[in-house]
Amino acid sequence: MTAEHDAAILPKPGGPLAVGKRATPEPGPNDVLIEVKAVALNPCDYYQRDYGMPPVPIYPAVIGGDAAGVVAKLGSSVTGGPVPGPGSRVIAFASSFYQNGSPDHGAFQKYALAQSEAVIPLPDNLSFEEGAVFPLAVLTALTAWTTIGIPLDTRYTPADKQAVLIWGASSSVGSFAVQSAKTLGFTVYATASPKHHELVKKLGADAVFDYKDSDVVSKIVDAVKKDGVYLHTAHCVVDGALQPTLDILKETKGDAFAKVAHSPVLPECHPTLDNTQITFNFPSMDEVVRTRISKLRRAVSRE
């Protein structure tokens, strides 16, 4: 471990990122210092860079949340439990946002700190590149349900006839959204490009539709009515999903109160629908470390 390391530094709002040197930090009591081998890019990374959303309180900044690498050093309070010792392969949710913008956290650097609760072992059968896509994608997919009031221990049965629409199901977040929706017991209607339909079905979707089809709204509505299920819940995973989602819910929810989790940042003047709650899906770190990391561990261990 060197005294300094390379980092992709954001010097000011709007960027651009520049490679520079940073002092390699010592981990705090509850931190894990990780030698980063791979990172994943997420839409929130360019939101932070270009728009300061989530807020960036300190510049120069280091952004990025998803990291995979090797444990370099443990904080003094990190003993036992699920976090392995130095030299072990791990994945981590290392966002600086949840650490008041501290640039010692943030995935886009060679050595990054992460809270111990947000670090889990990386199975030997997964590469660093494969492991890096897990943290934020899984957490975002799971947080969507609790954001709209669906506990993660929900288990609908076929008799409940509860359905959900996932728009953008072949993305990293969307693929985990499909799998978690099936675990909750939903009948899952999903959209994706035709080349991804078989994959999305294997993940658990009951029906998959081409989002570019000019008749996609009517086709989903017809399928829901034919199947005799109740569709008044949705997760908009990608930009541009909200209006067609609301068009579908307008025809399927009846008099029921509908709920939509929206993972991209909501535009200021976004479309609305009567008797429908539309909520920006934003994970809080308290929720992450208390209720979701165990779910992430189980998801990774199954790979």
From Swiss-Prot:
UniProt cross-references to PANTHER family, sorted A to Z: HYPOTHETICAL OXIDOREDUCTASE (EUROFUNG), ZINC-TYPE ALCOHOL DEHYDROGENASE-LIKE PROTEIN C2E1P3.01
MF terms in GO: nucleotide binding; oxidoreductase activity, acting on NAD(P)H
Gene encoding the protein: tazE
Lineage, uppermost ranks: Eukaryota, Fungi, Dikarya, Ascomycota, Pezizomycotina
Keywords, alphabetical: NADP, Nucleotide-binding, Oxidoreductase
Membership in a protein family: Belongs to the zinc-containing alcohol dehydrogenase family.
InterPro entries: ADH-like_C (IPR013149), ADH-like_N (IPR013154), GroES-like_sf (IPR011032), NAD(P)-bd_dom_sf (IPR036291), PKS_ER (IPR020843), Trans-enoyl_RdTase-like (IPR047122)
Protein name: Trans-enoyl reductase tazE
Pathway recorded for this protein: Secondary metabolite biosynthesis
Name of the top EC class for this enzyme: oxidoreductase
Positions in coiled-coil regions: none
Enzyme Commission number: 1.-.-.-
Function, in words: Trans-enoyl reductase; part of the gene cluster that mediates the biosynthesis of azaterrilone A and other azaphilones, a class of fungal metabolites characterized by a highly oxygenated pyrano-quinone bicyclic core and exhibiting a broad range of bioactivities. The first step of the pathway begins with the non-reducing polyketide synthase tazA that assembles one acetyl-CoA starter unit, five malonyl-CoA units, and catalyzes a series of Claisen condensations, methylation, PT-mediated cyclization, and finally releases the first hexaketide precursor through the R-domain.
Pfam families: ADH_N, ADH_zinc_N
Keyword Transmembrane helix: no
Entries under SMART domains matching the protein: PKS_ER
Binding site for substrate: L136, A137, V138, L139, T140, A141, L142, T143, V265, L266, P267, E268, C269
